UniProtKB/Swiss-Prot annotation:
Subcellular location(s) per record: Nucleus, Cajal body; Chromosome, Telomere; Chromosome
GO cellular component: Cajal body; chromosome, telomeric region; site of double-strand break; telomerase holoenzyme complex
Identification of the protein by name: Telomerase Cajal body protein 1
Native species: Bos taurus (Bovine)
Keywords for the protein's UniProt record, in alphabetical order: Chaperone, Chromosome, DNA damage, DNA repair, Nucleus, Phosphoprotein, Repeat, RNA-binding, Telomere, WD repeat
SMART domains: WD40
Length: 540
């Protein structure tokens, strides 16, 4: 099937008539970067014993006391600005455009100029969002989200293709997806959302950029300070098997830089997890019992090696996910060894080692207040909430269905009130973290079924009440029932996929309330997806 022609990327979130001309990217895998530097990097110490995770409820007291006494007032000093450092606004955002987007009240425009020394009385220095003409949107999960648009034709061109998560850009201008065909795709925010009034019909979304990796993509992430108004901050990092870490330009899709890691045999090793520091100065990468820290101002092989397991103590296994606290100078690491570790940002000193999951950790997320963080694991039906002030045991747990080794994402809204998670069964569940109270197992406030296939990715928009979901999973043929031995048909397949529901698609849902909260039959038939129960979803 021919891929629809991609519309231009609107970097500054302006209507399409003000967006710059698009840039094309050929669908070719980027060659592996060559390295000529003979210098070897330090290697982690050997050790195969599991981490010494104490069951004592006093585990983590050291960190708790440190946080109670107070933390350093300043974060690590950002390094010299490089390819990903913010700079002045792009010249493409003209002064005229900026002035058109801000309207002053009539009182301000008609007010005469004040002479020197005249007192200003009754003038409010701060304008409210209503005065500036902005609309404040909040997430509302009192009713089932309304389906807006999605992309499905893009992923059916290859057999057995499926999505592997989705992530909104920090500025909300576009969304990034990963799929089993080793292609990263960027979609613009649907142009219908820029129109005033309620838009009931949305066209199918088409990617504006495709970035092809050479092998299975392990992890991907946006630059933490990404803003479409500043093109030099619009970057995406990705890591794939037997390849260096690639930095892609989110405007053109071109490869802009590479970070390479080598083992003790000077062999290239791939990172299993990626995370930019909050100030954008560093890129943290997870390896086997090691975290390597690259400076974003110096692409190449130079990095700081932070070993997480030494002398048969510490956090063993592959570091599968990394997350930074938004308020404290520390970060959390999850490993496939079923352990969680907390480390200082400055030098990686260990603060606490936690255990409690039944499977390898696949995703971490900090609450915006910085006091709590959430963890999820593969083949584990629990999402655990941890309080940094009392790390002896989880604060509470949330139940979700995860029966495979696939990474099932979850996300928090910008206020931290709602937590949304996918599941192997396809159901999307929403919990109110503010109303959890002292309950050990809070129940979801809403649960709905976007499709029958696995919902592996969820991402909440940073400023609009938009929920993005990604679906699909790797499926294996099931044995067929044997028929009569006297049947003459001998070419019947021994394995069949007739009972498998393949629904690989990206979907956008409006979570701000509205008159119509059901998925239309026309969209259901066009996408080939299963209908939800109860007119668009099922309340819990």
């Amino acid at each position: 099937m021919k891929t629809p022609e991609a519309p231009p990327l609107a970097p500054d979130c302006l209507p399409s008539d003000q967006a710059p001309a698009p840039a094309r990217l050929s669908r070719q895998a980027s060659p592996m970067d060559k390295n000529t530097d003979p210098e070897l990097m330090p290697t982690p110490r050997d050790g195969d014993d599991p981490p010494q995770v104490s069951s004592d409820p006093m585990v983590g007291l050291a960190l708790s006391q440190e946080l109670e006494e107070g933390v350093p007032a300043s974060l690590p000093t950002p390094l010299e600005s490089g390819f990903g450092s913010p700079s002045e606004l792009s010249s493409r955002v003209e002064e005229k455009e900026l002035s058109e987007n801000v309207s002053l009240p009539a009182e301000e425009t008609n007010r005469p100029e004040l002479g020197p020394g005249e007192d200003v009385e009754g003038v409010s220095e701060e304008l409210t969002p209503e005065d500036e003409g902005y609309t404040i949107w909040n997430y509302n999960f009192s009713q089932v989200p309304r389906f807006l648009s999605g992309s499905w034709s893009e992923f059916i061109t290859q057999p057995e293709n499926f999505l592997k998560g989705c992530k909104w850009a920090p500025d909300g201008s576009c969304i990034l997806t990963n799929s089993a065909d080793n292609i990263l795709r960027i979609y613009n925010l649907p142009p219908e959302l820029y129109n005033e009034g309620e838009q009931l019909e949305y066209a199918e979304m088409a990617p504006v950029l495709r970035m092809v990796e050479g092998d299975t993509i392990y992890d991907y992430c946006w630059y933490s300070l990404m803003s479409s108004a500043q093109p030099d901050t619009s970057y995406v990092a990705s890591s794939s098997r037997e390849n260096p870490i690639h930095i892609w330009d989110a405007f053109t899709g071109e490869l802009r830089a590479s970070f390479r890691s080598y083992n003790h045999l000077d062999e290239l090793t791939a990172a299993h997890s990626l995370c930019f520091s909050p100030d954008g100065s560093q890129l943290f990468c997870g390896f086997n019992r090691t975290v390597r820290v690259f400076s974003t101002s110096r692409p190449g092989r130079d990095c700081e090696v932070r070993t997480t397991f030494a002398k048969r103590q510490g956090q063993s296994g592959i570091i599968s996910c990394i997350a930074f606290s938004p308020t404290q100078p520390l970060y959390a690491c999850g490993s496939y060894g079923r352990s969680l570790g907390l480390y200082t940002w400055e030098d990686g000193s260990p603060l606490a080692l936690l255990g409690g999951h039944q499977g390898g950790i696949t995703h971490l997320c900090f609450h915006p207040d910085g006091n709590c963080f959430f963890s999820g694991a593969r083949k584990d039906a629990e999402l655990l909430c941890w309080d940094l002030r009392q790390l002896g045991h989880p604060l509470w747990s949330l139940s979700r269905e995860v029966t495979t080794n696939q990474r099932i994402y979850f996300d928090l809204d910008p206020t931290g009130q709602f937590l949304v998670s996918g599941s192997t069964s396809g159901a999307v569940s929403v919990w109110d973290t503010g109303g959890a109270g002292l309950e050990s197992k809070p129940e979801p406030v809403l649960s709905f079924q976007p499709q029958k296939d696995c919902t592996n990715g969820v991402s909440l928009h940073p400023s609009l009440p938009l929920l993005a979901t990604a679906s699909g999973q790797r499926v294996f043929p099931e044995p067929t029932e044997s028929g009569d031995e006297r049947e003459e048909e001998v070419d019947l397949p021994l394995l069949s996929m007739r009972h498998v529901h393949l629904e690989c698609q990206l979907q956008l849902w409006w979570c701000g309330g509205g008159p119509d909260t059901s998925i239309s039959d026309a969209h259901q038939e066009e996408m080939g997806q299963g209908r939800t129960e109860g007119g668009g979803g099922e309340f819990t």
